[in-house]
């Protein structure tokens, strides 16, 4: 029997004291703050893990939103500078080229190994020519085409791109995808056919120019997918040389576009006025053409007051959508990107009805846009089902009929059976 004050009692009392001191430390303010910070860190880490797991879907949603904003602000920018469309396009291309140059310099300073990677520039020569045709036609067409009509006419790119990918890339499509393309086009055209109350400036000639721009754009999209899926793809060099060729080709297009004049002097005068007055319009908001002009006349009156602010916002949204486009192309396809962009048809209509977004380019919105939206979503779902069917058929063709282990076992059993039969026959005839 132990006495009081023995070593065991002392050790027990000391351990209980230690336990009490540990509990008191666990409830200290500093420990609570540490636990709170750890909890916040784990929550943020879990959120980032969830975002990373859903990154493709999030990028697709951002792509649609940015696509809507880019379309709206492009139309607003053209509306404010419609008398200087070709100079406006040159300013946009040159701005993006400067941004890519800055990115290239940073990559050269901090990631030289990436910049040393080989990249074939030759395909971009033809791509730049196609981009020049597409940009020039769409820019001149959009000058007198309403914002919503731009989006609806642009949906012809979906079947044209599918045809281009089939001819150039030999891509296979499921019949569901062809049906979905027809559904999307039907609901895209439903809006302008049934709703003729749009009072914005729409000229048939400009509508046709914008429609024709889809032909070179669809061919360029198919060739661009070939570039993106190449193992030698270099995103920085691709953007650098792409904008460079596009810029010089667009100068050629501008020179050809301003040719129909009576004299050489008039030709160079028109080029001078295009550049100087366009520069004043975009960067200083100066209206040059204010007399003998009107909405139904050629030229229209200048409206350059907010051109520079709209230009900055357009560059911001367009830069962001290019980044999202790269990520989607690396994990998807150009046809999926186009079909994803068709969701913007009703969403753009909503955006054009909101004055704080569309500004002077505001148009009316009605319930027909909801019908178009549901129809386009149905087409997208059918396209996704067709993509799944194609993927299942591809996996079925690529997978072996018999697993390696099973085939090896079957060969072994067959060989053993043949050996046993030969031994039996040998025993019978000897």
From Swiss-Prot:
GO terms for biological process: amino acid transport. It is a multi-pass membrane protein. It is found in: Vacuole membrane. GO terms for cellular component: vacuolar membrane. Keywords: Amino-acid transport, Disulfide bond, Glycoprotein, Membrane, Transmembrane, Transmembrane helix, Transport, Vacuole. Its main location: membrane. InterPro entries: CRT-like, Transprt_Chloroquine. Residues 1-53, 110-122, 169-173, 224-239, 330-335, 386-430 are cytoplasmic. Residues 1-22 are annotated as: Disordered. Residues 7-21 have a biased composition (Low complexity). The chain crosses the membrane at residues 54-74, 89-109, 123-143, 148-168, 174-194, 207-223, 240-260, 307-329, 336-358, 365-385. One of its GO terms (molecular function) is xenobiotic transmembrane transporter activity. Residues 75-88, 144-147, 195-206, 261-306, 359-364 are vacuolar. Glycans are attached at residue 195. Disulfide bonds join 281-304, 293-301. Belongs to the CRT-like transporter family. Nutrient transporter. Involved in maintaining the osmotic homeostasis of the digestive vacuole. This is Putative chloroquine resistance transporter.
């Amino acid at each position: 029997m132990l006495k009081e004050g023995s070593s065991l009692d002392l050790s027990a009392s000391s351990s209980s004291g230690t336990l009490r001191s540990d509990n008191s430390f666990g409830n200290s303010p500093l420990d609570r703050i540490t636990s709170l910070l750890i909890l916040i860190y784990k929550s943020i880490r879990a959120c980032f893990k969830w975002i990373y797991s859903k990154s493709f879907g999030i990028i697709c949603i951002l792509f649609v939103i940015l696509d809507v904003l880019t379309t709206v602000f492009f139309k607003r920018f053209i509306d404010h500078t419609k008398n200087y469309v070709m100079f406006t396009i040159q300013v946009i291309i040159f701005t993006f080229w400067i941004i890519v140059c800055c990115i290239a310099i940073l990559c050269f300073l901090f990631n030289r190994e990436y910049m040393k990677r080989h990249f074939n520039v030759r395909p971009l020569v033809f791509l730049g020519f196609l981009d020049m045709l597409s940009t020039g036609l769409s820019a001149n067409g959009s000058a007198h085409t309403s914002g919503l009509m731009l989006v609806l006419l642009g949906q012809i790119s979906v079947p044209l791109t599918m045809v281009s990918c089939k001819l150039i890339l030999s891509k296979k499509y499921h019949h569901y995808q062809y049906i979905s393309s027809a559904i999307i086009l039907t609901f895209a055209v439903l809006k302008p056919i049934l709703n003729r109350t749009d009072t914005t400036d729409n000229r048939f000639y400009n509508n046709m120019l914008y429609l024709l721009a889809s032909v070179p754009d669809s061919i360029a999209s198919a060739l661009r997918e070939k570039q993106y899926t190449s193992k030698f793809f270099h995103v920085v060099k691709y953007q650098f040389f792409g904008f460079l060729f596009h810029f010089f080709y667009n100068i050629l297009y501008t020179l050809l576009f301003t040719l129909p004049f009576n004299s050489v002097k008039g030709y160079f005068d028109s080029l001078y006025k295009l550049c100087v007055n366009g520069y004043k319009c975009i960067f200083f908001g100066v209206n040059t053409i204010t007399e003998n002009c009107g909405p139904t006349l050629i030229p229209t009156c200048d409206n350059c007051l907010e051109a520079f602010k709209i230009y900055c916002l357009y560059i911001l949204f367009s830069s962001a959508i290019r980044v999202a486009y790269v990520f989607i192309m690396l994990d998807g396809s150009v046809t999926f990107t186009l079909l994803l962009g068709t969701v913007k048809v009703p969403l753009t209509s909503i955006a054009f009805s909101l004055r704080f977004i569309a500004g002077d380019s505001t148009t009316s919105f009605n319930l027909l846009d909801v019908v178009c939206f549901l129809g386009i979503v149905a087409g997208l779902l059918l396209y996704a089902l067709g993509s799944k069917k194609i993927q299942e058929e591809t996996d079925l063709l690529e997978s072996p009929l018999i697993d390696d282990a099973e085939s090896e076992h079957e060969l072994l059993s067959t060989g053993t059976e043949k050996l046993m039969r030969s031994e039996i026959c040998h025993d019978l005839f000897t």
